[in-house]
Regions:
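Short beta-strand immediately N-terminal to the catalytic nucleophile in serine-hydrolase-like folds
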Residues: 142-144, 170
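Conserved alpha/beta-hydrolase
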Residues: 88-110
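Short beta-strand element of the alpha/beta-hydrolase
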Residues: 68-76
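Catalytic nucleophile-loop/oxyanion-hole region of alpha/beta-hydrolase
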Residues: 106-135, 139
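A short loop-to-beta-strand scaffold at the N-terminal edge of the catalytic core in hydrolase folds
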Residues: 53-63
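Hydrolase active-site cap/lid region
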Residues: 154-209
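Gly/Ala-rich beta-loop-alpha elbow adjacent to hydrolase catalytic centers
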Residues: 144-148, 152
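An N-terminal hydrophobic leader/cap segment in hydrolases
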Residues: 1-52
């Protein structure tokens, strides 16, 4: 309905609008990692929260704000939630409650295998469920960078509650295969037959390429 679309547009604009003043103040947020002050704020203000997904104990940081707008923030490959302090603070300053999560096998989350977003998509459903346990009326934006972007995009292909209103995917990739080819070429190493062997092993061991 027009009213529903208006509310959705307002939520997305709240998350993504950049005014001239904000562009001038971009150094305040210092990219995704944040300034030293933001890192301290992240450590001091965040509340540790946990879920169980695929028998793994996963860790996140919750930043409470007023209202029912939530941002679920996902980091990239080999990173961790605290490295997203700049994004977390920016969402928080715009009035969002924020949940920044450590992906499986990253940060303080359990796990030994990194799935580049495919198994991690299931974890997003668990985090959404946790948010809804706090606030059944939550309006949720999923935000991810790199592997986090791939994670939230793949999660968006699942059946999610209507509380999820938008997805912000920053520098995701078309496929793991293309990403690893690019990495190999960047390092000037042959991707064949290494990727083919790794793909076969992944399918045999974990059930997916």
């Amino acid at each position: 309905s027009p009213i529903h679309m208006s509310k959705l547009n307002n939520l997305v604009q709240k998350a993504t609008n950049t005014s001239a003043d904000e562009e001038e103040a971009s150094a305040k947020y210092s990219g995704l990692t944040g300034t030293p002050e933001m890192k301290k704020w992240y450590a001091d203000e965040g509340e540790d929260v946990y879920i169980i997904s695929d028998s793994l104990r996963l860790h996140g940081k919750r930043f409470k704000n007023s209202g029912s707008d939530y941002a679920l923030v996902c980091h990239g490959y080999t990173s961790k939630a605290k490295h997203m302090a700049g994004f977390v603070k920016k969402f928080y300053d715009r009035g969002f409650n924020v949940l920044a999560v450590d992906a499986r096998a990253h940060g303080d989350s359990e796990g030994a295998k990194i799935g580049m977003g495919w198994p991690e998509r299931r974890d997003i459903a668990g985090w959404i469920k946790l948010i809804l346990s706090w606030d059944p009326d939550a309006r949720i934006i999923l935000h991810g960078v790199s592997m986090g972007a791939a994670t939230v995009l793949m999660a968006s292909g699942e059946t999610l509650p209507e509380n999820v209103k938008a997805v912000i995917a920053d520098c995701g990739y078309t496929s793991e295969w293309d990403e690893f080819i690019w990495e190999a070429e960047t390092l000037h190493i042959p991707w064949f037959p290494v990727l083919n062997a790794a793909s076969a092993l992944s399918k045999l061991r974990d059930g997916y390429d």
